[in-house]
Amino acid sequence: MQSILTQETIIIALIYLSLSVLYLLVIPAVIYYYLNTRWYVASSWERGFMYFLMSFFFPGMLLLSPFLNFRPQRRTLKA
C-alpha cells in the first residue's frame, strides 16, 4: 500500500497554500497601498479599475480591513 502523502500530493498542497496566501493576503495588501496613494488623484477610468480590484479581491480585503484602516485625508482649503 502506498503512502497517502506522496511527493505529488505535497506539491499540490503547497501550490494551493501559496495561491490562497497570494489571493487573500499579498495582492490585497498591494491593492490597499495602491488605493491609498492614488485615491484622490485618480481619473474616472482608473477609479473604475479600483472598484473592479476591490470586488475581485473582496475576501482578502475583508480579511485585512480590521488591520489596515486608512482614514480620509483632510481637505486643504485655500483662502
Swiss-Prot record:
Leading EC class: translocase
Location (main, coarse): membrane
GO-annotated molecular function: oxidoreductase activity, acting on NAD(P)H, quinone or similar compound as acceptor; quinone binding
One GO cellular component, as annotated: plasma membrane-derived thylakoid membrane
Ranges that cross the membrane: 10-30, 48-68
Keyword NAD tagged: yes
EC number: 7.1.1.-
Compartment annotation: Cellular thylakoid membrane
Keywords annotated in UniProt: Membrane, NAD, NADP, Plastoquinone, Quinone, Thylakoid, Translocase, Transmembrane, Transmembrane helix, Transport
Reaction(s) the record says it catalyses: a plastoquinone + NADH + (n+1) H(+)(in) = a plastoquinol + NAD(+) + n H(+)(out); a plastoquinone + NADPH + (n+1) H(+)(in) = a plastoquinol + NADP(+) + n H(+)(out)
Domain of life from the UniProt record: Bacteria
Topology versus the membrane: Multi-pass membrane protein
InterPro entries noted in UniProt: NADH-quinone_OxRdatse_su_L (IPR019654)
HAMAP family xref list: NDH1_NDH1L
Protein family: Belongs to the complex I NdhL subunit family.
Complex formation: NDH-1 can be composed of about 15 different subunits; different subcomplexes with different compositions have been identified which probably have different functions.
Task of the protein: NDH-1 shuttles electrons from an unknown electron donor, via FMN and iron-sulfur (Fe-S) centers, to quinones in the respiratory and/or the photosynthetic chain. The immediate electron acceptor for the enzyme in this species is believed to be plastoquinone. Couples the redox reaction to proton translocation, and thus conserves the redox energy in a proton gradient. Cyanobacterial NDH-1 also plays a role in inorganic carbon-concentration.
Protein name stated in the entry: NAD(P)H-quinone oxidoreductase subunit L
